[in-house]
Amino acid sequence: PLPFILSRTYSSYRTKTPAPVGSLGPGWKMPADIRLQLRDNTLILTDNGGRSLYFEHLFPGEDGYSRSESLWLVRGGVAKLDEGHRLAALWQALPEELRLSPHRYLATNSPQGPWWLLGWCERVPEADEVLPAPLPPYRVLTGLVDRFGRTQTFHREAAGEFSGEITGVTDGAGRHFRLVLTTQAQRAEEARQQAISGGTEPSAFPDTLPGYTEYGRDNGIRLSAVWLTHDPEYPENLPAAPLVRYGWTPRGELAAVYDRSNTQVRSFTYDDKYRGRMVAHRHTGRPEIRYRYDSDGRVTEQLNPAGLSYTYQYEKDRIT
């Protein structure tokens, strides 16, 4: 029933209309990073692969379809879709409140669902802010609904240094997960304290990061760990350690992944000059896979010392 699955994908592709860098760092995306930009006559959906999908402006109840990605984008505002519409039955699985809201957008890649709900983060207004505040010119993922009406909810902070960021998830089985976030300053201080306790010289770890990368604006907030904090089936048997933990470079790049036994299972290396451009990755116990890029930032070689290696050539209408 809509279990919470924290997957991640990496792409060195840089769109001209990027969404902000997510909590996994530049180049990385997870499903929760889906974001819709509302322009004057265009809607730009940034998917969890970092690509930009363009749709025409939609009136309430209208839908757009991306043939390349087999994805529908529908604007709320109607109780029912036309009976002949492929999504008519799936639309009725949504709560009436969502169907009737013209300010919400919904996306799906199958008539079987699920729906990705694109809304906005409720936040605490500033003391001198004129109310009601206008809605932001973008929409973020607030939850999922499957064809049986079961939901998965993303909880975003309403105030503070993590305002707008996902800090909790409730899945379709009622389990609650806590996402621990850190700022660049917090990671820098932790690195200094570890160096002091270990009796070593602290390495260069800046307190701030540049506000922009080739992959979009970057607020420096990163995901540190994911905890299971509530399970209705086993309320007294919660794990005493995080389900997953992440390590970061001083430049805010994802460096390592640790499982629930605190064993490192993945490692990543990046270009010294281009922040976020991965040049190598490795599964623990396996050979390191390396990448080479051309001057345009495109992968030209994939080098595997223990298996097949690949070279890529870019032509006008194909890659060989």
Name each model feature, range by range.
Residues 1-10:
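Predominantly extracellular/luminal regions of secreted and cell-surface proteins
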Residues 3, 15-29:
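Short, polar loop/linker segments at the starts of domains and inter-domain junctions
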Residues 32:
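Short helix-loop capping/hinge segments that flank enzyme active sites or metal/cofactor-binding pockets
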Residues 26, 42-320:
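Extended charged/polar low-complexity repeat regions
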